[in-house]
Amino acid sequence: MKTEDLTAYAKQKESVEKEITSCLLSINNKMEECYSGLSDNYQDFFQNYADMLYKLEIKKEYYSLLLEETEKSDLETIQAYMMDVISTLTQELIEIKIGSSCVGGMKHLAAVLEFEAKLELLVKFTELACNIDI
């Protein structure tokens, strides 16, 4: 690779890492807001924050794993990892959609929240994967 190609490659990898780090920072900040609501009033927490916190926990797990992959891999491997996650998320969304109608109230609520979180992850991971120019 030429020097300018290596520089562009490094900048692109750095850009991907910054995007993921930014998402994790935003998630952590929102989680702190949720936890602060917990100490004030439990009823208010469950009415206004619990669903958001559940979705944030799901997203944090996926972004943390992606950041680990980004720190140790090249762009091609990162993109392949994201495509694998996209495929897995798509399959899980189908399974959640089919299975959520067959469960009780609380499990249904959890399935709906998981569906929403994973749908948002699917969109973001697809966007990130498509922005990698190899």
Segments and roles (model prediction):
Residues 2-9, 66-84:
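Intrinsic disorder/low-complexity detector
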Residues 90-134:
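Amphipathic alpha-helical binding modules
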Residues 53-75, 122-133:
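Repeat-associated, polar segments at repeat-unit boundaries in modular proteins
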Residues 30-45, 70, 96-103:
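Secondary-structure edge/capping motif, primarily at the C-terminal ends of alpha-helices
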